[in-house]
Structures are given as structure tokens and as C-alpha cells.
Amino acid sequence: MSQKRDNCIILLVDPPEADKISQEFKTAFGPERATHVNSDLLSAAYKLAKGFSESILLLSYLKTQRHPDLTWLDPEDPGFLEVKNPASEDRIQDAFRLAFFTGAKKAVLVRHLSPELKSEWVSLAFEAVSDKTAAIGANQDGSFYLLGLTQQNLKILETPGFFHGKSAESLAERAKKNKLTVFSTPETYALTSEETLLKWMESKETLPPLFPHPREAAQHETKKGHKHHTHRQEAQVQPPPEKPPL
């Protein structure tokens, strides 16, 4: 148990509400569909993080009146760090600080928008992280999907501007300026478009029809109304979805 508490996985979680989804994501998929896609990505990331037996899990959650807890994500209602400042960079710094305050020696932040993240990569990050080494996982678009640090290395997050754009490159440059070695986990992709959504779907042998093509969604919208939204709020953590019929 002591070794498990030495490691902490951090995951930022937002409620399944359209106004809590990034504008870029809503532009790519439409407000309602973006909410469903984002929730499925969060469920997959949460399942991976919760199932990682070699660490404790810290969830940074921006609760709302409609979703004051995480029962929509997990019926066991896991505890969470309540977000005071919704700005992503502040949330990340607060989560890392709490992880170390509660006794963790290493903390690894994972981002849910990279659906091909593997637990093996998280293990590699924990093994590599030290006071002299930061672990960074990059997406093909230059953003980061994983960041592993010790308390000694939190200084690379002190200056604003590390979350957006080509953030993996920015973090790596900051680490090197602080005389840290950068350990890179395998490159993957962030799901931000129809193309990457299909890429994720096609990477699975069996996927359920959770992500219908916009035309299919339009055809079924009048029949289903708000039924899908209600199910999403009550959804339990599910295994990776099966591929929908073309």
C-alpha cells in the first residue's frame, strides 16, 4: 500500500453539460453530440485511471447544481478535489500540489482527449519520473496527453501558458531550461475532429453506436428526443464502445 501511495494519477473531470465543453469541441461535433463524445472519453480515461493498481487517483472536478457529484461517471460516487478556479492551468497546479501534500512522491496527469492512452505508458512514466526527469506524452497535434512530475519539478508550471497550443513542446522546453531530462512516452493523437473520432472507432474491433455520423444522428434525433441525454447522465463506467454499423 505504501508504494501505491507514492504514486498519484491526476484526471481533470468536467460535468456532462454543453457549457462546460470547450468551444473547439462543440464546433467540431455540435453542442449536444460534443457532450456525449466528451463523456465517453472521460469514462474511458476514468476506467483506465481507476484500474491502475499502482497508484492512488485524484479527480479534479468542476461540480455544478445539475451534477454536484460524480455518480454520473461512477455509481460508487468517488471523492474528488472540488475546483475553486475553473482555469485549466490553475486546476492542474492545484491538483499536483494536493497530490504531493497528501504524500505522493510522483504524480502523473493524464488527459481524456487521447483515447489510445495505455496503462503501460502510465507505468513507464512513473518509472521514469524523478527529481531530475519529467515525463511528457505528446499528441500528433503537439498538445500533451500526459505529464509526470515530482514536487521538486512543479516549477515548470509556474509561468502561465503551458496548457494550450503545442503544449508538449512548451513543457519539454521548460523542463530542459530547468536542467531536467525529458522522458517521452509514445506519441498518440487527441480526439478533436470527425477524422480522429473515426480513427478511434476503427481501432476497435467491436464498438457500440455511441458516436453516430451527423446524418444518422439527425435521422434518429426526432425519434429519441432527450432520451439519450437522460441515459448519459445515469450512465455507469462502460468498457470501450463497440463499432457502430456503417
Predicted regions and their residues:
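N-terminal nucleotide-binding beta1-loop-alpha1 segment
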Residues: 1-25
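A short, N-terminal amphipathic alpha-helix
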Residues: 37-54
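Short beta-strand/loop segment that forms part of the nucleotide-sugar
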Residues: 54-63
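Short phosphate-binding loop-to-helix
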Residues: 69-106, 195
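Short aromatic-hydrophobic micro-motifs that form the base-stacking/packing surface
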Residues: 108-110
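Conserved donor-nucleotide/metal-binding helix-loop-beta segment in metal-dependent transferases, i.e.
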Residues: 116-141
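Short, glycine-/small-residue-rich phosphate/pyrophosphate-handling segment
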Residues: 153-172
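Conserved alpha/beta core of the MobA/IspD/sugar-nucleotide pyrophosphorylase nucleotidyltransferase superfamily
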Residues: 173-246
